[in-house]
Regions:
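Catalytic cores of secreted/periplasmic lytic hydrolases that degrade extracellular macromolecules
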Residues: 63
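Patatin-like phospholipase
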Residues: 1-60, 68-417
Length: 417
């Protein structure tokens, strides 16, 4: 879906170069994949815009990785190479960084267990507290995250320490803001703004993406920080408050509508099973998506009232897109397919809504490239072709295909009568 908000300008509007900001929401590995595919489509199909020359980048959680890369001069295609492709280069962002067990956190919590057990027994036996109340004290022995996120800081620091890049907010050409949430107050922490810009970009990224339950909170200057999406979905006001002419927002997570498209062709479409058939993970995913998207919708209504002189364009997936909703982002094959899917879907959205988008973008010197939009053979990624004379490669390819087909069957099969 592409949503636009119209700016109301006076005749004295500035004729200087338009101020452009880019706000990227979170969404885990899936969010990063979608945003990369969508950005590549925008870069290919919009003339007059350079996504490495924005005035302000705002990133939350996974969107922070993309925002930081763009601010450091990495093009959308280079980000695709780093996040999506599975080539043995030092530029790759390996998803294995995200699934290392948090042994240090677990060990620290286990050390507390004897004392907590003693405290619980004392409260129950000596103080006469109810057993359930006494056992609540054992909650402090549970780890705050199951995966270690320290590797995120180390690897991003390495990538941004290369020549021509910087891990220091203050040395970037454009403004970069990475938003986390302070755990003890619930306040937003806009790393990169004055007073917050001394923190390394890699550490701010680690904090902004520290989703509670998955990753432990990140300690910065003696305070604990967690995922920035806990406070807001986009934090677009960070850029809007500083004044921009055009704000482009990318939101990768939308609630899924398990119903066919309306229209004459709807009767011939295959029945989409209820999400309840996917069990707890699917129900929780839909719940989480619905909550963050409702916040986003309320936020955009507020933006329209409070920032009438700014054009705002929101780009997000179709809510009936089952491929994105049921994706396995830790599968290399599916990462490539999802990035290509996001690329093609974004191009289709631009074609469908060009009458609505064109005049708004033209006010800022941006034009739709009709040739690129109509090019049916244009792709983000070239198909991977394994050598026919490599038995191991062929076997691995067949295994990937079988597993992907099995997963697709399990997530989309209809309920039994």
């Amino acid at each position: 879906m592409v949503t636009t908000r119209k700016a109301h300008r006076s005749s004295a509007a500035s004729k200087t170069r338009p101020r452009l900001a880019l706000a990227l929401a979170g969404g885990g590995p899936l969010g990063a994949i979608y945003e990369i595919g969508a950005l590549c489509a925008l870069a290919d199909c919009l003339q007059g815009i350079d996504f490495n020359a924005c005035d302000h980048y705002v990133g939350v959680s996974a969107g922070g990785f993309i925002a930081a890369g763009l601010a450091n001069g990495l093009t959308p295609r280079q980000l695709c190479e780093a996040f999506i492709e599975d080539r043995p280069t030092e530029e790759n962002f390996d998803t294995a960084w995200l699934i290392k067990p948090a042994w240090a956190e677990l060990g620290d919590r286990l050390q507390r267990l004897p004392g907590l057990l003693g405290s619980a027994l004392w409260a129950w036996t000596a103080q006469g507290k109810p057993l359930t109340q006494a056992l609540e004290r054992l909650g402090a022995a549970l780890p705050t995250g199951v995966f270690d996120n320290e590797d995120i800081h180390r690897q991003v620091e390495r990538l941004f320490s290369r020549e021509g890049r910087s891990n220091d907010f203050r040395q970037l050409r454009a403004r970069l803001t990475l938003v986390a949430t302070e755990l003890d107050t619930g306040d937003a922490a806009p790393f990169g703004r004055p007073g917050w810009d001394h923190v390394p970009i890699s550490r701010a990224l680690q904090a902004s993406a520290a989703l509670p339950g998955l990753f432990p909170p990140v300690v910065i200057d003696g305070k604990h920080y967690v995922d920035g999406a806990l406070k807001k979905t986009l934090h677009a006001t960070v850029a809007l408050d500083e004044g921009v002419d055009l704000l482009i927002c990318l939101n990768p997570l939308v609630p899924f509508r398990a119903e066919p498209h309306a229209g004459p062709a709807a009767s011939g479409q295959q029945r989409i099973p209820s999400l309840i058939e996917g069990g707890l993970p699917t129900v929780m995913s839909q719940t989480f998506r619905s909550m963050i998207h409702s916040r986003l919708e309320l936020g955009f209504k507020q933006y329209e009232r409070s920032y009438p002189d700014t054009d705002i364009v929101l780009i997000e997936p179709d809510q009936r897109d089952a491929e994105l909703f049921f994706a396995n982002t830790f599968s290399y094959r599916q990462r490539r397919e999802l990035a290509e899917h996001a690329y093609q879907q974004t191009r289709q959205m631009l074609r469908d809504r060009q009458a609505q988008l064109a005049p708004k973008l033209q006010r800022h010197g941006i034009h739709l490239d009709q040739t690129a939009l109509d090019d049916t053979g244009r792709r983000l990624l070239q198909p991977v072709r394994l050598a026919a004379d490599r038995p191991t490669a062929r076997a691995v390819d067949r295994l990937h295909t079988t597993l992907d087909q099995l997963q697709q069957h399990l997530t989309t099969r209809p309920a039994r009568a």
